[in-house]
Amino acid sequence: MARIAGVDLPKRKRIEIGLTYIFGIGRSTSSKILEELGIDPDTKTDDLTEGQVNDIRKLIDSKYRVEGELRTQISMNIKRLMDLGCYRGLRHRRGLPVHGQRTSTNARTRKGPRRAAVKKKGGAKKK
């Protein structure tokens, strides 16, 4: 089993798809990596030689920011926006949608479950 950037790649899948299991590498980046190294994208992960796996590992380590390093960078960027106090930072801080979506309805994923409305106990008073 090939292990690249701390991720075990699936054995029976094509290497082009297998590389997308690494956080930060999608289909286009995967294709670019394989094209640069001259590896056939249709090759199964199991069929790669140890040398090819090492080449992929070296290229990803040198050129791309993946996994923990990328997650850290993303969280630091969000933290920076929150510290600046800009509009996007405030939206992150309040847990609301950041990219201009409506919030009157929808946005339930970002806002969380609905809070129950408080009901009055007595109802209408009689004289």
Curated annotation (Swiss-Prot):
It comes from the Bacteria. Residues 108-127 have a biased composition (Basic residues). This is Small ribosomal subunit protein uS13. Signal peptide: none annotated. Located at the top of the head of the 30S subunit, it contacts several helices of the 16S rRNA. In the 70S ribosome it contacts the 23S rRNA (bridge B1a) and protein L5 of the 50S subunit (bridge B1b), connecting the 2 subunits; these bridges are implicated in subunit movement. Contacts the tRNAs in the A and P-sites. Part of the 30S ribosomal subunit. Forms a loose heterodimer with protein S19. Forms two bridges to the 50S subunit in the 70S ribosome. Residues 95-127 are annotated as: Disordered. One of its GO terms (molecular function) is rRNA binding. Keywords: Ribonucleoprotein, Ribosomal protein, RNA-binding, rRNA-binding, tRNA-binding. One of its GO terms (cellular component) is small ribosomal subunit. One of its GO terms (biological process) is translation. InterPro entries: Rbsml_uS13_C (IPR027437), Ribosomal_uS13 (IPR001892), Ribosomal_uS13-like_H2TH (IPR010979), Ribosomal_uS13_bac-type (IPR019980), Ribosomal_uS13_CS (IPR018269). Belongs to the universal ribosomal protein uS13 family.
